[in-house]
Regions:
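A short, surface-exposed alpha-helical micro-motif characterized by mixed small hydrophobic
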Residues: 114-116
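Short catalytic/signature loops enriched in Gly
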Residues: 134-175
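Conserved ABC ATPase signature
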Residues: 47-51, 55
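ABC ATPase "signature
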Residues: 129-133
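Conserved ABC ATPase "signature" region
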Residues: 25-42, 151-152
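Conserved catalytic motifs of ABC-family nucleotide-binding domains
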Residues: 68
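Q-loop/switch helix immediately C-terminal to the Walker
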Residues: 6-19
Protein backbone atom coordinates (compact mmCIF):
# COMPACT_ATOMS: atom_id res chain seq x y z
CA UNK A 1 0.00 0.00 0.00
CA UNK A 2 3.06 2.21 0.15
CA UNK A 3 2.41 5.77 1.29
CA UNK A 4 -1.37 5.32 1.39
CA UNK A 5 -3.02 4.91 4.76
CA UNK A 6 -5.43 1.96 4.58
CA UNK A 7 -8.27 4.00 6.14
CA UNK A 8 -8.11 6.86 3.61
CA UNK A 9 -10.17 6.93 0.44
CA UNK A 10 -8.77 8.14 -2.86
CA UNK A 11 -10.81 11.33 -2.30
CA UNK A 12 -9.02 11.96 1.02
CA UNK A 13 -5.60 11.22 -0.48
CA UNK A 14 -6.20 13.66 -3.34
CA UNK A 15 -7.81 16.29 -1.08
CA UNK A 16 -4.63 16.41 1.04
CA UNK A 17 -2.77 17.51 -2.08
CA UNK A 18 -5.29 20.31 -2.73
CA UNK A 19 -5.47 22.21 0.59
CA UNK A 20 -6.11 25.67 -0.89
CA UNK A 21 -9.36 24.66 -2.61
CA UNK A 22 -12.90 24.62 -1.24
CA UNK A 23 -14.53 21.21 -0.72
CA UNK A 24 -16.51 21.51 -3.98
CA UNK A 25 -13.41 22.61 -5.93
CA UNK A 26 -11.38 19.78 -4.37
CA UNK A 27 -13.96 17.22 -5.46
CA UNK A 28 -14.12 18.64 -9.01
CA UNK A 29 -10.31 18.75 -9.29
CA UNK A 30 -9.96 15.24 -7.80
CA UNK A 31 -12.34 13.87 -10.44
CA UNK A 32 -10.35 15.67 -13.17
CA UNK A 33 -7.11 14.21 -11.84
CA UNK A 34 -8.50 10.68 -11.65
CA UNK A 35 -9.86 10.97 -15.18
CA UNK A 36 -6.47 12.20 -16.39
CA UNK A 37 -4.94 8.91 -15.22
CA UNK A 38 -7.65 6.66 -16.64
CA UNK A 39 -9.78 6.29 -13.52
CA UNK A 40 -13.11 7.94 -12.71
CA UNK A 41 -15.35 9.45 -10.10
CA UNK A 42 -16.32 6.01 -8.77
CA UNK A 43 -12.74 5.57 -7.54
CA UNK A 44 -13.05 8.54 -5.13
CA UNK A 45 -14.74 6.39 -2.50
CA UNK A 46 -12.32 3.48 -2.84
CA UNK A 47 -9.69 2.68 -0.23
CA UNK A 48 -6.20 1.53 -1.28
CA UNK A 49 -6.84 -2.07 -0.19
CA UNK A 50 -9.68 -2.30 -2.73
CA UNK A 51 -7.55 -1.03 -5.63
CA UNK A 52 -5.24 -3.08 -7.82
CA UNK A 53 -1.55 -2.22 -7.88
CA UNK A 54 -1.99 -0.39 -11.17
CA UNK A 55 -4.94 1.60 -9.83
CA UNK A 56 -2.99 2.56 -6.69
CA UNK A 57 -0.12 3.71 -8.90
CA UNK A 58 -2.56 5.82 -10.95
CA UNK A 59 -3.94 7.43 -7.76
CA UNK A 60 -0.35 8.18 -6.71
CA UNK A 61 0.34 9.78 -10.10
CA UNK A 62 -2.88 11.82 -9.87
CA UNK A 63 -1.86 13.00 -6.40
CA UNK A 64 1.56 14.06 -7.68
CA UNK A 65 -0.04 15.91 -10.59
CA UNK A 66 -2.31 17.84 -8.19
CA UNK A 67 0.64 20.13 -7.43
CA UNK A 68 0.99 20.89 -11.17
CA UNK A 69 4.73 20.16 -11.06
CA UNK A 70 7.19 21.16 -13.74
CA UNK A 71 9.16 17.98 -12.99
CA UNK A 72 7.79 14.64 -11.85
CA UNK A 73 10.27 12.28 -10.16
CA UNK A 74 9.26 8.66 -10.77
CA UNK A 75 11.38 6.47 -8.50
CA UNK A 76 10.85 2.81 -9.45
CA UNK A 77 7.32 3.80 -10.50
CA UNK A 78 6.55 0.48 -12.20
CA UNK A 79 8.88 -1.97 -10.46
CA UNK A 80 6.16 -3.61 -8.33
CA UNK A 81 3.73 -4.02 -11.23
CA UNK A 82 3.32 -6.94 -13.60
CA UNK A 83 4.54 -6.43 -17.17
CA UNK A 84 1.14 -5.63 -18.73
CA UNK A 85 0.31 -3.08 -16.04
CA UNK A 86 3.85 -1.68 -16.37
CA UNK A 87 3.18 -1.05 -20.06
CA UNK A 88 -0.12 0.67 -19.26
CA UNK A 89 1.46 2.94 -16.63
CA UNK A 90 4.39 3.74 -18.95
CA UNK A 91 1.89 4.63 -21.69
CA UNK A 92 0.04 6.84 -19.21
CA UNK A 93 3.23 8.62 -18.12
CA UNK A 94 4.20 9.23 -21.74
CA UNK A 95 0.71 10.57 -22.48
CA UNK A 96 0.90 12.90 -19.46
CA UNK A 97 4.36 14.09 -20.51
CA UNK A 98 3.04 14.99 -23.96
CA UNK A 99 -0.27 16.53 -22.84
CA UNK A 100 0.89 18.43 -19.74
CA UNK A 101 4.48 19.20 -20.69
CA UNK A 102 5.72 17.88 -17.35
CA UNK A 103 9.36 16.77 -17.43
CA UNK A 104 10.12 13.41 -15.82
CA UNK A 105 13.10 12.01 -14.04
CA UNK A 106 12.59 8.26 -14.19
CA UNK A 107 14.68 6.21 -11.77
CA UNK A 108 14.78 2.49 -12.51
CA UNK A 109 16.97 -0.59 -12.35
CA UNK A 110 15.00 -2.15 -15.21
CA UNK A 111 16.97 -1.57 -18.42
CA UNK A 112 13.98 -2.50 -20.61
CA UNK A 113 11.83 0.13 -18.90
CA UNK A 114 14.61 2.72 -19.21
CA UNK A 115 14.97 1.96 -22.90
CA UNK A 116 11.22 2.34 -23.39
CA UNK A 117 10.61 5.56 -21.43
CA UNK A 118 13.83 7.58 -21.59
CA UNK A 119 15.29 9.97 -24.13
CA UNK A 120 18.49 10.40 -22.11
CA UNK A 121 20.03 8.13 -19.52
CA UNK A 122 22.46 8.50 -16.63
CA UNK A 123 24.15 5.34 -15.37
CA UNK A 124 25.18 5.58 -11.73
CA UNK A 125 27.52 3.45 -9.66
CA UNK A 126 28.13 4.09 -5.98
CA UNK A 127 26.31 7.43 -6.18
CA UNK A 128 28.36 8.74 -9.11
CA UNK A 129 27.43 9.17 -12.75
CA UNK A 130 29.68 6.89 -14.81
CA UNK A 131 28.03 7.36 -18.20
CA UNK A 132 25.34 9.56 -19.70
CA UNK A 133 23.83 10.44 -23.03
CA UNK A 134 21.15 9.54 -25.54
CA UNK A 135 19.51 6.32 -24.38
CA UNK A 136 20.11 4.51 -27.69
CA UNK A 137 23.78 5.53 -27.75
CA UNK A 138 24.50 4.60 -24.12
CA UNK A 139 22.60 1.31 -24.21
CA UNK A 140 23.64 0.48 -27.77
CA UNK A 141 27.36 1.24 -27.41
CA UNK A 142 28.26 1.60 -23.74
CA UNK A 143 31.72 2.96 -23.01
CA UNK A 144 31.98 2.41 -19.26
CA UNK A 145 32.72 -1.09 -17.92
CA UNK A 146 29.91 -0.81 -15.35
CA UNK A 147 27.33 0.02 -18.04
CA UNK A 148 28.57 -2.93 -20.09
CA UNK A 149 28.28 -5.17 -17.01
CA UNK A 150 24.71 -3.98 -16.35
CA UNK A 151 23.69 -4.69 -19.92
CA UNK A 152 25.39 -8.09 -19.88
CA UNK A 153 23.39 -8.98 -16.76
CA UNK A 154 20.02 -8.40 -18.46
CA UNK A 155 18.43 -11.81 -19.02
CA UNK A 156 17.55 -12.42 -22.67
CA UNK A 157 16.13 -15.22 -24.73
CA UNK A 158 18.76 -16.59 -27.13
CA UNK A 159 18.56 -14.73 -30.43
CA UNK A 160 16.67 -11.76 -28.96
CA UNK A 161 18.03 -8.28 -28.39
CA UNK A 162 17.48 -5.87 -25.52
CA UNK A 163 15.04 -3.90 -27.69
CA UNK A 164 12.91 -6.96 -28.38
CA UNK A 165 12.57 -7.74 -24.67
CA UNK A 166 11.49 -4.22 -23.64
CA UNK A 167 7.93 -3.84 -22.32
CA UNK A 168 5.27 -4.01 -24.99
CA UNK A 169 3.18 -0.88 -25.34
CA UNK A 170 -0.43 -1.71 -25.99
CA UNK A 171 -3.88 -0.22 -26.18
CA UNK A 172 -5.16 -2.78 -23.69
CA UNK A 173 -7.87 -1.61 -21.30
CA UNK A 174 -6.69 0.51 -18.42
CA UNK A 175 -6.20 -1.26 -15.12
Amino acid sequence: LGPFGPRFTAAKLLAEALPALSNAERRRRSIELLESVGLGEAHLSRKPVTLSGGQRQRVAIARALAAEPEVLVCDEAVSALDVTVQAQVLDLLEHLRVTTGVAMIFISHDIGVVQHIADRVLVMKDGRVVESGDVDAVLGSPTHPYTRALLAAVPTIPGETLASTAPVVSDAGRN
